[in-house]
């Protein structure tokens, strides 16, 4: 939803997208790539996977672990259908916070990574900057906008350009 709504039309085709695919074995390789994946493995579990340039970023259960027992908090693939809506819908997030007596929350990005490294490592800088702006607009206007201060915006900056970052 974020990229379809907030990314300018000229970038939507090349921007981040989610595909539901079967995800086989994940192999730790380290570095900025982190993992190698076996995609479309027959009989492997379904997973909602982010794709952006050459990045393949599967959603993993440990990132959206709420509602799962401790022993189920694994690196296993997960779809949005299996996640609690508070993991990706701001109103549901605030409802979860209220039921857990949490006054405020700062949400860190997943696919963009904690400070936007995904876009800093991108080849297409124009697209990357558009993604940073779209993410920030979404974070301030949509994710946090109607939360009455319960959701605190955490924006990302274009790490590859000090002048753009300072602007």
Task: Pin down the residues of each PLM region.
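Helix-coil boundary/capping segments in enzymes
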Residues: 1-167
């Amino acid at each position: 939803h974020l990229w379809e709504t907030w990314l300018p039309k000229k970038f939507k085709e090349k921007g981040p997208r989610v595909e539901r695919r079967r995800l086989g074995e994940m192999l730790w390789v380290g570095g900025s790539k982190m993992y190698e994946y076996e995609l479309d493995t027959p009989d492997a579990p379904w997973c909602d996977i982010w794709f952006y340039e050459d990045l393949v970023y599967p959603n993993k259960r440990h990132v959206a672990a709420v509602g799962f027992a401790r022993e189920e908090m694994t690196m296993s693939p997960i779809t949005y259908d299996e996640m609690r809506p508070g993991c990706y819908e701001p109103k549901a997030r605030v409802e979860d916070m209220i039921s857990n007596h949490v006054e405020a929350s700062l949400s860190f990005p997943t696919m963009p990574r904690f400070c936007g490294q995904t876009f800093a490592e991108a080849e297409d800088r124009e697209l990357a900057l558009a993604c940073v702006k779209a993410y920030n607009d979404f974070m301030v206007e949509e994710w946090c906008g109607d939360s009455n201060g319960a959701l605190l915006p955490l924006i990302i900056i274009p790490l590859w350009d000090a002048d753009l970052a300072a602007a």
